[in-house]
Amino acid sequence: MKWLVLLGLVAFSECIFKIPLRRVKTMRKTLSGKNMLNDVLKEHPYRLPQISFRGSNLIIHPLRNIRDTFYVGNITIGTPPQEFQVLFDTGSSVLWVPSVLCNSSTCSIHVRFRHLQSSTFRTTNKTFWITYGAGTMKGVVAHDTVRIGDLVSIDQPFGLSMAEYGFHGRRFDGVLGLNYPRQSCCRPTPIFDKLKNQGAISEPVFAFYLSKDEQEGSVVMFGGVDHRYYKGELNWVPLVKADDWTIQVDRISMRREVIACSDGCDALLDTGASFIHGPGRLIDDIQKLIGSEPRDLKHYISCSAVNTLPSIIFTINGINYPVPAQAYILKGSTGHCYTAFRAKRVRTSTESWVLGDVFLRLYFSVFDRGNDRIGLAPAM
């Protein structure tokens, strides 16, 4: 039987598992400073991750945000614990970190898991690979104790990266996937599912508050919701299918004119994506409407446009979610401003979008596995 939403979702901070997040400088800014951005973006256009394999408490975990739009937090793996900085990602489902056996140049600049130093480690003969927009990793499935704040998952399956290609300038060690599990004979159980199954969290929900602050204030919470992080009421949106954090969008408009998604479209809410991604033709139309100019794989615009351009409104389940110009116009390290709209390079049979951190900073988001839906409300 579905659990009672009104009692289960609203909780007070003393009953919460809160995990702090940090906002880290994106690969884009790192590469811009090294004059490497254009080459990398041509080689690795945005696409969703593709993966192949051969209690009653609410935990709120802080995340960190450094200068741009990736939000990372700390976890530990092993006994004694080894600490890693990971991206909490609703667009993928696997937890992985680099192995000490990985000799790729990308692995060498990150914290690597030393399996021989953990008394609770065990390996398997299962291998896998994951392709993200920015690169590919290959690894093996292993098991060990994983801790997210006060949450503990014993004998948790996770990936150990043995080789990494791409990922230039990555500012986090690994990824903690929070999407639905993918059906495969060899795929490890996602950590959220294992925590849920072993009763470590009382309700099958997690939520994100992504602060606009450059460093502190962002959190991911497990097992319920702290209502102090949002204003008003949560508006619930059913998932398109109970296997992915994708919802239906009614339309996208500006100045009361529909500019995209005229017949409805799908949108993935992806904490692992920095921007708002959509079909190339429609993104180009939006860039023209707001007056941006393409240059070096970005669309630049006058910084003063934040004071004159209207909001772009995503209507979801009958509710309007404005994205103001102050959110979709970003200032780079050189002082020039550019837009937060990006074209998806992988074509799909239907119109689909990705609502990344530009959208999620504006709206507190609750991911409800118990009822296969997402809750949205204006963030505090």
UniProtKB/Swiss-Prot annotation:
Domain annotation Peptidase A1: ranges: 71-377
EC number: 3.4.23.-
Disulfide bond annotation, renumbered to this chain: 102-107, 261-265, 303-337
Residues at the active site: 89, 270
Pfam families: A1_Propeptide, Asp
Extent of the signal sequence: 1-15
Propeptide residues according to the Swiss-Prot or TrEMBL record: 16-53
UniProt note on tissues of expression: Trophoblast and placental tissue. Produced specifically in the invasive binucleate cells of the placenta.
Keywords assigned: Aspartyl protease, Disulfide bond, Glycoprotein, Hydrolase, Protease, Secreted, Signal
Residues annotated as glycosylated: 74, 125
InterPro entries: Aspartic_peptidase_A1, Aspartic_peptidase_AS, Aspartic_peptidase_N, PEPTIDASE_A1, Peptidase_aspartic_dom_sf
A GO CC term assigned to this protein in UniProt: extracellular region
A molecular function GO annotation: aspartic-type endopeptidase activity
Subcellular location: Secreted, Extracellular space
Example of a GO biological process term: proteolysis
Sequence similarity: Belongs to the peptidase A1 family.
UniProt-recorded name of the protein: Pregnancy-associated glycoprotein 4
Organism: Ovis aries (Sheep)
